[in-house]
Amino acid sequence: MSFLVAIVGRANVGKSTLFNVLTNSHDALVFDFEGVTRDRQYGQAKYDDLDYLVVDTGGISDKDVGFDEFMAKQSQIAIDEANLVFFVVDGRSGLTTGDEYVASLLRQKDKKVVVVVNKVDGTDEEAAMAEFYSFGFDKVFAISAAHRRNTQKLVDKFLKKPLNEYYQDYTQTQEHKEQQRHGIHFSLIGRPNVGKSTLTNRMLGEDRVVVFDMPGTTIDSVSIPFERHGQKYTIVDTAGVRKRGKVKQTLEKFSVIKTLQAIQDSNVVVAVVDARQGISDQDLSLIHFAIKNGRALVLAVNKWDGMTEEDRIQVKQDLKRKLFFLQDYVDIHFISALHGTNVGHVFESIDTAYACANKKITTADATCLMQLAVEAHSLPMVGKFRIKLKYAHVGGHNPPVIVIHGNQVSRLPNSYKRYLENFFREALDFRGTPIVFEFKQSENPFADRKNKRSKDEGSKSKKVK
């Protein structure tokens, strides 16, 4: 599960602008994939190679009634789940009753809160911050999100330490969980009403999850441990993720965050697609997110029963066209969650993907495969010199990380990197898991001697003169 930063405050104080600064700095919004409109409500950001999630909770007001009141209450869910809260206020307009209301809500929570005084461009920062100390929060900081003034300092000062502490604790906790779990943790993801909860019940063999024929029945991730044929599993039925324009309720927006966190916390992700609706950009976004996070993947095309042969051919052609990047290694199953058709095969692919994602490979085997790949397809020339790959070893699991050391590796063409991935995948029979390749430049063991010799020769020449 990722570190979560919640941006809260009344309306029109610049929360969305700060959100864009935090997420756009590394162009890493959750749904910022080709052909998909960037979502401005929740996103993924990076600080010093550490990923974290950001949620803009929308304006909070003490005058909210009806549906707006419901949304304001659900915004508090995001605050409850957050590891750090940026409470944004407007430095130009000064302290308002709306700000005081938000502050009163935050004082009831045991949360790390930073009062972010925005829009201070052209004003005295100290004067702008002064009145906001009355909230009782000891951390107050002035920025101009629109002009990115002090925004990096904000992150360096208030995010760096808790983020590093969180991941240290989280790594230890995850290692403990893995020791205790000894099973496969997989999540079902997809749009609303594609049959995730029905598939969950079918896999469990009982009605553990409430199912209705309407979108959005599941609003939070439901985690259920179980055992099948002696193998332990934990299944996570996630909330459906809809198209950006249709995600309006704050509760639903936060359920998207929970879904993304479930993906990151899984060993294997099962992407469920409705055969009758086809695969959408939103399906592709979720699949891309899973792959980007190194998750093993299985695709289940549901509601296959009752379709004509002509429609089935059309669906398969559509899948082949849109999922061309998965054809080589991801298993695709055409199922009926309602009737149980082919659900057993989904389990088989989950087991296979998990095993491949955690496959043990010795340094000798990795190096041997690398050498065989080079023998089969020579390395390209870089100027007068040929790139040289020396040895390879495994740098991690789930996903498998192959680290290759050599000379001039930074100039290795992407086409050759793809060739290496395909070669390793075929040789090791990797199914269902992405493979990450890291290329490291080998250090010259004689570099220091050479530099020292040059210095000595320089000193001697000076003496001669």
UniProtKB/Swiss-Prot annotation:
Sum up the protein's function in the record's words.
GTPase that plays an essential role in the late steps of ribosome biogenesis.
Q: What is a biological process (GO) this protein takes part in? A: ribosome biogenesis
Q: Which InterPro entries match?
A: G_ENGA, GTP-bd, GTPase_Der, KH_dom-like, KH_dom-like_a/b, P-loop_NTPase, Small_GTP-bd
Q: Please name the gene that encodes this protein.
A: der
Provide the binding site for GTP 2: 190-197, 237-241, 302-305
Please give the subunit comment from the record. Answer: Associates with the 50S ribosomal subunit.
Using the UniProt annotation, give all residue ranges assigned to the region (Disordered): 446-465
Q: Which NCBIfam families match?
A: GTPase_EngA, small_GTP
Family recorded in the similarity comment: Belongs to the TRAFAC class TrmE-Era-EngA-EngB-Septin-like GTPase superfamily. EngA (Der) GTPase family.
UniProt KW Repeat keyword: yes
**Ranges where the EngA-type G domain occurs:** 3-166, 184-358
Gene3D superfamilies to which the protein is assigned, alphabetical: 3.30.300.20, P-loop containing nucleotide triphosphate hydrolases
Which CDD domains does the entry link to? EngA1 (cd01894), EngA2 (cd01895)
Tell me the HAMAP family matching this sequence. Answer: GTPase_Der
Keywords on record = GTP-binding, Nucleotide-binding, Repeat, Ribosome biogenesis
Annotated GTP 1 binding sites = 9-16, 56-60, 118-121
* Chain ranges of the KH-like domain: 359-443
**Gene Ontology MF terms in the entry:** GTP binding; ribosome binding
Q: What is this protein called?
A: GTPase Der
- Biological source species: Francisella tularensis subsp. mediasiatica (strain FSC147)
